[in-house]
Design a protein with these regions (language model features):
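Acidic, serine/threonine-rich low-complexity disordered tracts
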Residues: 1-78, 108-197
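Beta-strand/loop-rich accessory regions of lumenal/periplasmic or secreted enzymes
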Residues: 95-113
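Acidic/charged, solvent-exposed loop-and-adjacent secondary-structure segments enriched in E/D, K/R, S/T
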Residues: 80-99
């Protein structure tokens, strides 16, 4: 995926799915670097490894570095019929069936609560499906399923959780857009750059 702001590429999101017998590891790296007059104005980095076994989310190992001094190490594992995780709010004992807040997984939109992989916390979510919409991916026009995604605010959040607009085609994430709460005038677009029919 390319990360676009004001028609300029400001970063990338790379996700790899590594299959190993009955498990899949989803390794994702998101890098954003905004410069204004060649001076760094905003940086963000997130690396996450999710492990899924027989279709069930069983562990996570991640790290998030925000533009300020906030850094979070995210760890979580299935233990004794619970999902034991740690992050911004310390250790959490969660429902074993919780799934990560990761937009590649279309089924995540059906959940009421998800595990935020950037901060290691639980958020309640609200999703609304809109009318299908034609979008272009690599100059190919497709009719995509469109959703609006909102999530609850944590008391430690520095601002509201941004509203996301998501587009899927054949259950694959193609595009998403949101406004950074600190940069409300400009929309951030994250769009597939490796897809073709």
């Amino acid at each position: 995926f390319d990360v676009i702001r004001k028609k300029k590429n400001i970063g990338s999101l790379i996700s790899k799915f590594i299959e190993n017998e009955d498990s899949v590891i989803m390794h994702s790296v998101l890098k954003i670097n905004v410069k204004v007059l060649f001076i760094p104005a905003y940086k963000f980095f997130q690396e996450t490894k999710e492990t899924w076994t027989n279709g069930e989310f069983v562990s996570i190992d991640g790290f998030t570095d925000f533009e300020d001094d906030r850094e979070y190490k995210i760890i979580g594992n299935d233990e004794d019929n619970f999902f034991i995780a740690s992050g911004m709010d310390g250790q959490l004992k969660l429902d074993k069936n919780i799934v990560p807040l990761n937009y590649w997984n279309l089924e995540m939109l059906n959940e009421k609560e998800v595990f935020d992989t950037q901060k290691g916390i639980v958020r309640t979510i609200e999703v609304k499906q809109l009318e299908d919409e034609k979008i272009k991916i690599n100059e190919i026009e497709i009719l995509a399923n469109k959703y609006v995604f909102n999530a609850s605010k944590n008391p430690k959040d520095k601002g509201p959780f941004p509203e996301y607009t998501l587009w899927y085609f054949a259950k694959e994430l193609m595009k998403m857009e949101f406004k950074n709460p600190n940069d409300k005038k400009n929309i951030i677009t994250i769009i597939r750059n490796d897809w073709s029919l």
